[in-house]
UniProtKB/Swiss-Prot annotation:
GO terms for biological process: amino acid biosynthetic process; aromatic amino acid family biosynthetic process; chorismate biosynthetic process. This is Chorismate synthase. CDD domains: Chorismate_synthase. The keyword Cell division does not apply. InterPro entries: Chorismate_synth, Chorismate_synth_AroC_sf, Chorismate_synthase_CS. It catalyses: 5-O-(1-carboxyvinyl)-3-phosphoshikimate = chorismate + phosphate. It is an enzyme of class 4 (lyase). Keywords: Amino-acid biosynthesis, Aromatic amino acid biosynthesis, FAD, Flavoprotein, FMN, Lyase, NADP. One of its GO terms (cellular component) is cytosol. Its EC number is 4.2.3.5. Reduced FMN (FMNH(2)). Belongs to the chorismate synthase family. Pathway: Metabolic intermediate biosynthesis; chorismate biosynthesis; chorismate from D-erythrose 4-phosphate and phosphoenolpyruvate: step 7/7. It comes from Acinetobacter baumannii (strain AYE).
Length: 363
């Protein structure tokens, strides 16, 4: 099965299934000398792990990461870093009823048609469970970028279903299970998700992820533009159906004289492009937004077919998120960090000796 690696010089490869023994990752390309402990990774894993609130899946996994290689005496050695998280709370019996049927809206049908066989327990490899390793790997990238450049990567939820957050206070984001910066929106989010669970359905979400203090010059035109690789990384996250960079789809209704991000000797006058021009970072804050679809794992009966191609009904059991966007923020942060780390190394490899004609202008 191909497609389990991302990045060129900073390369992350993951493996593992929802109800298997555990999850693993190999993170290659980490420069030597970075002080790194399991606790550095655990902070973000704890933000993503299931069972932490009544608004997410009640599967309880400690997601305790183990560093099994690539770190010696508390520092990275420059060799591949091996990471392991063991699964502890699988309930495979919950999925016996779908062994012969396909859950509509899931990867069951396509995995079976592509591979001729599938692990039906919790979705197997297609489960969002695999994103735990992305978060662990992304935490390494976040730490390196923060220490070397002061890069700050952080995200927040802007919409749950039809409820929209109207303001952003970063101090509020870690204080609620929705990663929302609008304290007034949180009760509305809570009421909506509670109602959806009672109704046996689910809803989508929208998140914004920012990367501040990214140096100018990262990105490899034309096919590996920074925004192209960011979009690729974000679209690889389960349930993501749309990605916006900067003003995103709103540009269709804008005018050039309003949105060309004019610049002066003192800095840029706007950031409609989201910190990327011509596929290269401009030094401004990189702004990314993603939209996640409602999970199809709901307790409302639906129509499907079985392995004999016979019509049947299906009722999804198991422990699922009524809104997958609730826990997606640290995942999206991790994917942005992985892409930025890769592009830093690629830029350094080719352009380390380049002397720009003048110092970068201020964002």
């Amino acid at each position: 099965m191909a497609g389990n690696s991302i990045g060129q010089l900073f390369r992350v490869t993951t493996c593992g299934e929802s109800h298997g023994v555990g999850l693993m990752a190999i993170v290659d390309g980490v420069p030597p000398g970075l002080a790194l402990t399991e606790e550095d990774l655990q902070k973000d894993l704890d933000r993503r792990k299931p069972g932490t609130s009544k608004f997410a899946t009640q599967r309880k996994e400690p997601d305790q990461v183990e560093i099994i290689s690539g770190v010696f005496e508390g520092k990275t050695t420059g060799t591949p870093i091996g990471l392991l998280i063991r699964n502890t709370d699988q309930k495979s019996k919950d999925y016996g009823n779908i062994a012969q049927t396909f859950r509509p809206g899931h990867a069951d049908y396509t995995y079976t048609q592509k591979y001729g066989f599938r692990d039906y327990r919790g979705g197997g490899r297609s489960s969002a469970r695999e994103t735990a390793m992305r978060v662990a790997a992304g935490a390494i990238a976040k730490k390196y970028l923060a220490e070397k450049f002061g890069v700050l990567i952080r995200g927040h939820v802007t919409q749950i279903g039809n409820e929209v957050a109207e303001k952003l206070d970063w101090n509020e984001v870690p204080n609620n299970p929705f990663f929302c910066g609008d304290v007034d929106a949180v009760p509305r989010f809570e009421a909506l998700v509670t109602s959806l669970r009672e109704q046996g359905t689910s809803c989508g979400a929208k998140l914004e992820i920012l990367a501040e203090k990214v140096p100018v010059g990262w990105g490899e035109p034309v096919f590996d533009r920074l925004d192209a690789d960011i979009a690729h990384a974000m679209m690889s996250i389960n349930a993501v159906k749309g990605v916006e960079i900067g003003d995103g789809f709103a540009v269709a209704g804008q005018f050039g004289h309003e949105t060309r991000d004019e610049l002066t000797s003192h800095g840029f006058l706007a950031n409609h492009a989201g910190g990327i021009l011509g596929g290269i970072s401009s030094g401004q804050t990189i702004r990314v937004a993603i939209a996640l679809k409602p999970t199809a794992s709901i307790t409302t009966p639906g129509k499907t077919i079985n392995l004999n191609r016979e019509d049947t009904d299906v009722l999804t059991k198991g422990r699922h998120d009524p809104c997958v966007g609730v826990r997606a923020t640290p995942i999206a942060e991790a994917m942005l960090a992985i892409v930025l780390m890769d592009h830093f190394l690629r830029h350094r490899a080719q352009n380390a000796d380049v002397v720009p004609p003048f110092a970068p202008i201020e964002p």
